[in-house]
Amino acid sequence: MALRSRFWGLFSVCRNPGCRFAALSTSSEPAAKPEVDPVENEAVAPEFTNRNPRNLELLSVARKERGWRTVFPSREFWHRLRVIRTQHHVEALVEHQNGKVVVSASTREWAIKKHLYSTRNVVACESIGRVLAQRCLEAGINFMVYQPTPWEAASDSMKRLQSAMTEGGVVLREPQRIYE
């Protein structure tokens, strides 16, 4: 009963002379005429408002903090990879220049933890690298800076995390800023 009333309602609407559907039309003229004048589209606005703040980063034009040469780790980045290793867990964060965490992965997460034998060893670091690389690509972050301390860079677990990130498609080096 409900289908019948809906059908007749649609049928009566389509029988109106003002209703133009391509499937029901037998004429060869287009169903709708464009209302916008194409000459009007060629005018360029004198001011440009950037509504996407990431656009400047992707074009390598955005500002980087350059006055922190004597500080370690350097503050000259748009996105930075931070790895935090505790007694029981490994956590990797992607931090934006303003200090906010954009993407993170940790062995505290149950979805990662249930696949690991240990939440601290080399395999855990490699798994965190794979998961974080996938999440970064899903978030649109392809480049980031990784500045490990010398003793972190020498460890096998950090080397495996770096290789998992690069194999996942993330470049651990940001492009140079264009100053012109």
From Swiss-Prot:
Molecular function per GO: 5S rRNA binding; structural constituent of ribosome
Stretches that traverse the bilayer: none
Protein's UniProt keywords contain Membrane: no
Tree of life domain: Eukaryota
The organism's taxonomic lineage, starting at the top: Eukaryota, Metazoa, Chordata, Craniata, Vertebrata
Family of this protein: Belongs to the universal ribosomal protein uL18 family.
Function: Together with thiosulfate sulfurtransferase (TST), acts as a mitochondrial import factor for the cytosolic 5S rRNA. The precursor form shows RNA chaperone activity; is able to fold the 5S rRNA into an import-competent conformation that is recognized by rhodanese (TST). Both the cytoplasmic and mitochondrial forms are able to bind to the helix IV-loop D in the gamma domain of the 5S rRNA.
Name of protein: Large ribosomal subunit protein uL18m
Keywords: Chaperone, Mitochondrion, Ribonucleoprotein, Ribosomal protein, RNA-binding, Transit peptide, Transport
Compartments, as annotated in UniProt: Mitochondrion
SUPFAM superfamilies tied to this protein: Translational machinery components (SSF53137)
One GO location term (cellular component): mitochondrial inner membrane
Quaternary structure and interacting proteins, as annotated: Component of the mitochondrial large ribosomal subunit (mt-LSU). Mature mammalian 55S mitochondrial ribosomes consist of a small (28S) and a large (39S) subunit. The 28S small subunit contains a 12S ribosomal RNA (12S mt-rRNA) and 30 different proteins. The 39S large subunit contains a 16S rRNA (16S mt-rRNA), a copy of mitochondrial valine transfer RNA (mt-tRNA(Val)), which plays an integral structural role, and 52 different proteins.
Primary location group: mitochondrion
Gene Ontology terms: biological process: mitochondrial translation; rRNA import into mitochondrion; translation
